[in-house]
């Protein structure tokens, strides 16, 4: 989860659409179940929100 927070935090500074990160997480963690996907998406979003608020 901490890696997802960090990935989310750098995402505003990369030339990659945020949706691409979300899509990749769904593909990578999808077979582990929806709970795992949701947990990682929430961590990704938390990192993004933090970075955008603290630029």
Regions found by a protein language model. Name each.
Residues 1-4, 11-55:
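Aromatic-enriched
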């Amino acid at each position: 989860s901490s890696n997802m927070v960090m990935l989310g935090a750098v995402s505003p500074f990369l030339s990659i659409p945020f949706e691409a990160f979300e899509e990749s997480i769904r593909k990578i963690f999808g077979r582990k179940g929806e709970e795992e996907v949701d947990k990682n998406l929430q961590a990704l979003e938390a990192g993004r929100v933090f970075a955008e608020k603290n630029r």
